[in-house]
Amino acid sequence: MLSPCLAAPATECRDPADAPAAPARHTGPARPRKRRPRNWKPHLPRERLLERGPAALTDAELIALLLGTGGGGRDVFASARALLARFGDSLRDMLDAEPDVFATHPGIGTARSAVLIAVTEIVRRALVEKARERLQIDSPGAVEDYLRLRIGTRPHEVFVTLYLDARHGLIDVEESARGSLTRMAVYPREIVRRALVLNAAALIIAHNHPSGAVQPSAEDRRLTRVLHEALALIDAKLLDHVVVGTADTFSFARAGWL
């Protein structure tokens, strides 16, 4: 007598043990699949930045990403290269440029100029913050580097005061006055009053010369003398007056004028 399996068609008498295993089912939450946009072009700066990091891009390509489009029918990469070339291919010189320079460059315009100005200001503030964290008052070079970074490229005169404690630790940094290209109103009594409020034992004052020249004027020397004498009345000391240019500084203390 034949077994039912032998009598049945081959497809119906297959041993269950020989049947292929059913694929395992994923019972957990669906796993997200990384999908690239349909217009993904791995050779373009944006895509290379996302895949390989910003170090993979040239200076001009980074600028092109900020510009977004070239404007006025211009190629964005050509606009970025031309803008960088205007500053001798120097990102530092570009960051130090006057804000209105960007808007007047062909293909940039107001909107793109605003983006560039915002980025340069973000970079400047980050560098100032980092320099302040590392600032050592007992190191004249570090103080001058900090001041040059903070006010060296300002288009107008700015007066800055560093208030220090008895151990020359930094209490606060304040911009006490701002002025025109050639004139600025500084009130010693306000600086002395602020020193009393902060209980400061010593001060360093500084201002910039937008012209770039750091030679002190007669008015600079007079202000230094008046403030030095006023601070002495409250037992506080003026440690230095630093005149800041775009690339250099002048220290009253180093010159022996304090």
UniProtKB/Swiss-Prot annotation:
Positions of the MPN domain: 136-258
GO molecular function annotations of the record: metal ion binding; metallopeptidase activity
Residue stretches of biased makeup (Basic residues):
31-43
Record carries keyword DNA damage? no
Residue ranges for the region (Disordered) are 1-43
Find motif (JAMM motif) and give its ranges. 207-220
Kindly give the PROSITE patterns that the UniProt entry links to this protein. Answer: MPN, UPF0758
GO annotations under biological process?
proteolysis
Q: Binding of Zn(2+): at which residues?
A: 207, 209, 220
Q: Which InterPro entries match?
A: MPN, RadC_JAB, UPF0758, UPF0758_CS, UPF0758_N
Keywords of the record, alphabetical order, are: Hydrolase, Metal-binding, Metalloprotease, Protease, Zinc
Give the superkingdom in one word.
Answer: Bacteria
Entry similarity comment: Belongs to the UPF0758 family.
- Protein name (record): UPF0758 protein Bamb_2548
What organism, scientifically named, is this protein from?
A: Burkholderia ambifaria (strain ATCC BAA-244 / DSM 16087 / CCUG 44356 / LMG 19182 / AMMD) (Burkholderia cepacia (strain AMMD))
